Amino acid sequence: MAQNLKDLAGRLPSGPRGMGTALKLLLGAGAVAYGVRESVFTVEGGHRAIFFNRIGGVQQDTILAEGLHFRIPWFQYPIIYDIRARPRKISSPTGSKDLQMVNISLRVLSRPNAQELPSMYQRLGLDYEERVLPSIVNEVLKSVVAKFNASQLITQRAQVSLLIRRELTERAKDFSLILDDVAITELSFSREYTAAVEAKQVAQQEAQRAQFLVEKAKQEQRQKIVQAEGEAEAAKMLGEALSKNPGYIKLRKIRAAQNISKTIATSQNRIYLTADNLVLNLQDESFTRGSDSLIKGKK
């Protein structure tokens, strides 16, 4: 390139006339390069552009998509918008239906409506988020929260969030904004109300505990009554069995001896037992007399 310029300079006539011609050529080339540079611009991905011309203002019918575009230098210049969704956290103190102070924070995912960029620029400019979002969020929050009591804001949080999102989305359309997502990120109350809620929860837990103890005592009382009735019925049945069959006591004694022998057999110690040790003295006269006297007493 430098060699070409030298060759071009060598061909030009020397003297003042030659210098003037060279200067004109350089100025012409510079003007062409500047014109080409100023006539071309690029719209990046996720952006849109509109034209503003110095005679008619914003061109309402021109919205430029991504890519390379041309303009008339000085007469037109592009205004580029980022149309990608951007998150923003907005906090607002407000009051509930029962006059409790509520601090609520929202995460709003918003983007401009690409089809309405010319009118948005005329009304709001490029800093539309700062002009619109805080005001409409505060407006909607105060309107929705005032419909619920403080306790309902906790128990019906999903419904509150849905109502806020619905009303805020409709309100944002008036300003050419699209809300992709609205979510409650924080919900807090005053210290006094929080302390009152905690005290109420403690009282409810104590009441539930007291009720549990009462029910437990009633259950134990019913269990004892059933047990006593069962023992009385068992005693009655035992008396009837003895009166009908005097040998029933001997049978019970044999079963008791069997249980004793099984327990001792599984023990590691070795013990030698007699019939007396196993309560098997069934032929003992004292045992027979005791059984007979018991049967006579039942009669």
From Swiss-Prot:
Record's keyword terms, sorted: Acetylation, Cell membrane, Coiled coil, Cytoplasm, Membrane, Mitochondrion, Mitochondrion inner membrane, Nucleus, Phosphoprotein, Receptor, Repressor, Transcription, Transcription regulation
Residues modified to N6-acetyllysine: K147, K200, K236, K250, K262
UniProt region (Necessary for transcriptional repression), positions on chain: 19-49, 150-174
Record's comment on post-translational modification: Phosphorylated. Tyrosine phosphorylation is indirectly stimulated by IGFBP6.
Organism encoding this protein: Rattus norvegicus (Rat)
Subunit structure, as described in the record: The mitochondrial prohibitin complex consists of two subunits (PHB1 and PHB2), assembled into a membrane-associated ring-shaped supercomplex of approximately 1 mDa. Interacts with ESR1, HDAC1 and HDAC5. Interacts with ZNF703. Interacts with STOML2. Interacts with ARFGEF3. Interacts with SPHK2. Interacts with COX4I1; the interaction associates PHB2 with COX. Interacts with MAP1LC3B (membrane-bound form LC3-II); the interaction is direct and upon mitochondrial depolarization and proteasome-dependent outer membrane rupture. Interacts with IGFBP6 (via C-terminal domain). Interacts with CLPB.
BP-aspect Gene Ontology terms: antiviral innate immune response; B cell activation; cell migration; cellular response to hypoxia; cellular response to retinoic acid; estrogen receptor signaling pathway; mammary gland alveolus development; mammary gland branching involved in thelarche
Predominant cellular place of this UniProt entry's protein: mitochondrion
Pfam families: Band_7
Residues the record lists as N-acetylalanine modifications: A2
Protein's recorded name: Prohibitin-2
Similarity annotation: Belongs to the prohibitin family.
Entry comment, domain topic: LC3-interaction region (LIR) is required for interaction with MAP1LC3B/LC3-II and for Parkin-mediated mitophagy.
Modified residues (Phosphoserine): S151
Residue numbers of Phosphotyrosine PTMs: Y128
Function: Protein with pleiotropic attributes mediated in a cell-compartment- and tissue-specific manner, which include the plasma membrane-associated cell signaling functions, mitochondrial chaperone, and transcriptional co-regulator of transcription factors and sex steroid hormones in the nucleus.
Coiled-coil positions: 190-238
Compartments where located: Mitochondrion inner membrane; Cytoplasm; Nucleus; Cell membrane
